[in-house]
Amino acid sequence: GKYAHLTFETANFRNYTPEGRDITNTYDSIVRNEWVLHGYYKYNCKPRNRMYLHVMYHAYMYATWYHTAYVVSTAEAILDPAKMRNPKSQGAAWGPSHEIGHMNQIRPGALWHGMTECTVNIPSEYITTYVFKQPSRLQEERMGDGNNRYSLAFSHIIAGETPFCSAGSTNSKDGVMQGVDVFKQLVPFWQLEL
């Protein structure tokens, strides 16, 4: 594509993406819209290279500074444009948007100590909610007590008067927060977007 380069098993492309252009357009849309969100176009600093996504066989999903990787068992979801763009669910787009988001994280602007996994979810929420018109994960996901993530964040951060950077932490060990809920941390950032 124009913004993304995908390398997966040929059989997976044939099985899940009969029209290759559809999945290419889907990933181009993710990458381009993340670049817009991060201000790459506004400040004329758009990367010259495509985002590289490829299959691997030893982990789930991860990102480095130069590629993202997806375990072969995810191919059915992430190579199917209908599943990626499904407006009635949170779809399969969250994972790739999250990993591509790691490659786009602005340093030091949105990459603070202890907040990496929170701030990378800003583009994931943006892509799934605004670009693919899927329900917000913060509003739709029900937690163990039946509340959504917004309700939990409100009761913990606002009512509980807890700094959002430590939202959900259960204790501190050697100065490192344990059990931080990155989705509770995400709520105040997402409020800025709304």
Residue ranges and their predicted role:
Residues 2-193:
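Catalytic cores of extracellular degradative/oxidative enzymes
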